[in-house]
Every structure is written in C-alpha cells, then in structure tokens.
Amino acid sequence: MDFPSRFDVIVVGGGHAGTEAALAAARMGVKTLLLSHNIETLGQMSCNPAIGGIGKSHLVKEIDALDGAMALATDQAGIQFRTLNSRKGPAVRATRAQADRILYKAAIRHKLENQENLWLFQQSAEDLIVENGAARGVITQTGIRFNSKTVVLTAGTFLGGVIHIGLENHSGGRAGDPPSIGLAQKLRALPFRVDRLKTGTPPRIDARSVDFSQMQAQPGDDIDPVMSYMGNRAMHPRQIECFITHTNERTHDIIRAGMDRSPMYTGVIEGVGPRYCPSIEDKIVRFADKNSHQIFIEPEGLTTHELYPNGISTSLPFDVQIELVRSMKGMENAHIIRPGYAIEYDYFNPQDLKYSLETKHMPGLFFAGQINGTTGYEEAGAQGLLAGLNAALLAQEKDAWTPRRDEAYLGVLVDDLISMGTKEPYRMFTSRAEYRLILREDNADMRLTEKGRELGLVSDERWAAFCKKREAIELETQRLRSSWIVPNTPEADSINPKLETPITHEYSLLDLLKRPNIVYSDIANLKNGLDEPVDEQVSEQVQIAVKYAGYISRQAEDIERLRRQENTELPDDLDYSKMEGLSNEIKQKLTQLRPATLAAASRIQGVTPAAVSLLLIHLKKRAIARKSA
C-alpha cells in the first residue's frame, strides 16, 4: 500500500548520519520522514561512548555551527570533558567528551521528536521506488510504499552486515540488530562500485569485577570545556574519571596463540579495517616490537556498571577474549558482559557521488556515513547534515551547497572522498586540512553559521546568539585597539613583569597582546570600562586573531590563489582521451571521475602539476576556438 502522506525527503537509518540528515532537512522546512528499523535505537552509540578528538571535534563544531544536534547532545550527556593538544597551537586543539550512552540517545530522541516538519516511522527499508531512473521513495519490509522527492541512505554497517567472533559468524547490522539484506542486494544491482569494509568493537566489562586501585586514574579537565556554541557547563551531568591499564607480554602471547582462530588472519574476513583504530590483533602484528599497549577504561554511563576498554577491539574467539582481558593489571577477575566482535559490511565507492552527496547514477538518491567508506560518529554526522541539506535543496529545486576545503573540515572530508576515494575506513585528522589554522574548532561558527542562516538551517535563537557574539568580538577588538598604556603608570607596572623589557613608550592593549609572553587575561582588566567580564568564547577569538594575524593572512593569500584555480570549471563534455600530453592513466582517471574544476582535478591521485598545466592550456585553446567560430 502507499502511505497516505507524500514526503519531500526520506532518510533511511537512525544513526548519527541519519539523525543529522533528518534534522537538517526538516530545519530547511521540507516534509521529512526518518525511517528506522527500531526507533528505540535512534542516536545509539554503537561503538565507543565518546564524541570528539583530534580532527573529529572540528567536525562536531561545524555540525553545531549549522545548528545540528551532536554537540549539544554531547554537552547534555558528557560525563568527562578534556581538551587534547592543549599545549599546542589552536589549529590542532580538540575537545573530547566521554558520554553517557543513555543520556546521549535520550537527547537525540528528544531533539527528533520535537523537530517541526519531521515524522518518525519504524520499518526496515527493503527497496527503492525508482521513476524515470530517479529515486522517488522506499518500500519497507511489510510492503508499505513511502513516496518522496529525494531519499537519503544512511545504512551504517547494516548493508550485508556479517558479525564475526572467532571462526563463528552470523548476519547482523550490529550486535542484537538484523542486517539489511534486501536493500543491499537491490543496491548491488545498480551501477555503483561496491566493496567490503570491516570494523570492530571490544568486549564490555562489568566495573564491579575490576580493581581500579591497580590502574592509573585519568580525570577530566579541571575546567571542563563545552562542546556546543549554545552549550554551557551547567548542562553537564556529574563528571567522573576514566582509567588506564596496559597490555603486557602475557597478553600478547595469548593473542598470538589465538591467531589461528582469528577471522582476520585466517582469511574469513576480507573487508579492510580502520588503519587508525586497529584491533588488538592488528596491533600485536603491526607493532611486534612493542611489549605493551595503553588501554583506556571508559565508563559507559552514570547508571550502568558497563565499561568500554578502548584499545582492545577484537574478533578473537570468546575464550581468548576472556584470557587476554584477565591478563591485564586490575582486570584479573574481570567479567565480560558482551563479547567483542568484528563486523563486515558493504560500502560504495564515494567517487560515484557528486559533491552534494547525491549519487551520480541515480538522481534524488543521497548517501551519507559509513556507506561512503568513512568511520566515526563525527564523520557520519557531518555527512548526514550535508546530505539532508542538499536533499532538501533538491526537493525545493534549489542549487546544492558544499563547503570548500578552505571553509570547513566537512569540505575537506567530502573532497577527499570524492576526488581520491577510499580503500579503507576514512577518519578525519587535522593533518588532512591544508588550511588548519583557519579551520579551527573554536571558529566553526564564524566560518559557517552565517551561511547556514542563509540556507535556512539556523534557528532564530542560534542566529541571535551568533550575532551577539560576533558583535562582542568586534567591540572588544576595538576596545583593545583604542586603549593605551603609558610608561610609569600602575597599568604599566602591572604588565612589566610579564615582558622581557619594561614598557618605554605608549602601547595599545592590542599591540601588547601581540607579545609572545602576554595572554588575554593579563590585559583583560586594564583600562576596562566594561560592566561585565568578556565571554570566554569572545576573548578566545580576539586573542587568536591577534596572535596569529600574520599566519592567518598568509593562509588567506594562499586560499585566494587556489580559489582562482578552483573556479576554473572543467566542462562535462571534455574528451580527455584526445588530449595530447596526458598519460593514459591520467586520461582514464579524469574520464572516470569527471572532476568539476581544475583544482579538483589537481587533487586526484596521480594527476601531476604538469597535467594540470596541460588542462589549463587546453581550456584556453578551447575558449579561443569557440570565440573565433
């Protein structure tokens, strides 16, 4: 039967990509359906109970800047907050939060249920409705037809999912959930390039069976950072400690002895696993010279005894899992609540996508999350928001939008996937961004919120808060510029101990802040005519802008040079096979990938600077030929 209502956007899957996609589309004002096989698992943290980290928190902040849900849900559920790389420069600082699974899921569910224009429905999607080659809805397992203008697939690890524990395996999307077999088969019949990837999770431990006195405590920051620009510390639940233990030679011997029953090392699993989150088996093989590995013992929440031992993801047989867990200090009597496992699943080559995340082979169909070969909640959420936004724009017959590499880590993520593809689960790092001094986690709102408002993503409440913050930054910068310190005054005497040489002439507070030994707090109250303290988000922006002005200016110049090249479009009808001077390999890649711009072509693996120059020459000749025709 046909469902009585017709939708503009249907989102399939209720994980981190799906929830952000559905919320984004609904915020755009279009009628949106979120379809999940089980609405009790919406927003579930399937693996580690944490949000953020190096590179990842930048994505979370960008989601937040565009009014997404992840950052605020983290503030409402975070039970430990830390700033990573706090002693390094602002470009690579990152916020990481340990989250209470139950509180996080509840925060996401609350957001979904109270979002205008969004409907929820519990059913598995088994097929697509296709009209004239375009996606026009989905058919569920019970035969209900949901019609729509666009479809966003965020299937996670569910497409053809197979769970492995030792040499035993069974079909599953994750532990306790069925896989999506019918939809996987339907998608495989379409002209998409499909392959298999693998990820894994560690066994979960009962905290009552662990001796924490034998471990190193790892508390959060004394002043816990806030994840959302709209969040505050008062939102945070009770804060608790994590702990650290280590593997040892005995642990490694146990693992080596079990390798003959490892699905990874006996060829049972063919999918490639994540390079930067390897299983404990992988660590022992790849880092054979190391006799110990650090393991982080992370509580799963405030109302559960369950622990997540971060660092021992494994698909070894359960008897080996028991032995290896109990070989570690403090875990000698550990009781495993859930076994660790690996899961193998289908993913689709992201080079078959447009930059909007719409598929090239089927108009109206968008992919987001692990289906595109990424790993991580943050990467999934960011893609979901972009796919939901662009599905809504397409439903409204408006042009798509994707941030550039110099505008957002989301732009880096999408460009990497589409220009280079991936053969292993893709994880975001700050090192992937050329312009990371501009793409900091602290300024994501300054980069994206205005654009989000223009697109229709950003609420009145967030927009008002953003405008207030932006104005405060301008006012405080102006105050520092116009406030002067002269020698032999109480103000000068208070700041001189911080300087290498005392003040000998008049300085503005802005110039003083440029000094390497001076931080904002040193000058905040000098010549301060303000009624109340400056908000820490405001003072942070002021300080970074002053301290790094020269570097930021140089990056802006680099970006402008690249942008001139970025805007050089490569027409769809270019016949690369007839271009003289290009190697056959480059011709093949350009024909297959059809990059939209010269800059996009330059980022394709194997496309040399010389080849880019040849393309530019060809475009100029083509333009001259057309003018004279």
UniProtKB/Swiss-Prot annotation:
SMART domains the UniProt entry points to: GIDA_assoc_3 (SM01228)
Taxonomic superkingdom: Bacteria
Listed InterPro entries: FAD/NAD-bd_sf, GIDA_C_N, MnmG, MnmG-rel, MnmG-rel_CS, MnmG_C, MnmG_C_subdom, MnmG_C_subdom_sf
GO-annotated biological processes: tRNA methylation; tRNA wobble uridine modification
GO molecular function: flavin adenine dinucleotide binding
Binding site for NAD(+): 273-287
Pfam families in UniProt: GIDA (PF01134), GIDA_C_1st (PF21680), SAM_GIDA_C (PF13932)
Compartments where located: Cytoplasm
Gene3D superfamilies reported for this sequence: FAD/NAD(P)-binding domain (3.50.50.60), GidA associated domain, C-terminal subdomain (1.10.150.570), tRNA uridine 5-carboxymethylaminomethyl modification enzyme MnmG/GidA (1.10.10.1800)
SUPFAM superfamilies recorded: FAD/NAD(P)-binding domain
Location (main, coarse): cytoplasm
Cofactor(s), by name: FAD
Record-listed FAD binding positions: 13-18
Keywords, comma-separated and alphabetical: Cytoplasm, FAD, Flavoprotein, NAD, tRNA processing
Gene Ontology cellular-component annotations: cytosol
Family named by the database record: Belongs to the MnmG family.
Purpose of the protein: NAD-binding protein involved in the addition of a carboxymethylaminomethyl (cmnm) group at the wobble position (U34) of certain tRNAs, forming tRNA-cmnm(5)s(2)U34.
Quaternary structure (record): Homodimer. Heterotetramer of two MnmE and two MnmG subunits.
PANTHER family noted in UniProt: GLUCOSE INHIBITED DIVISION PROTEIN A (PTHR11806), PROTEIN MTO1 HOMOLOG, MITOCHONDRIAL (PTHR11806:SF0)
Name of the protein this chain belongs to: tRNA uridine 5-carboxymethylaminomethyl modification enzyme MnmG
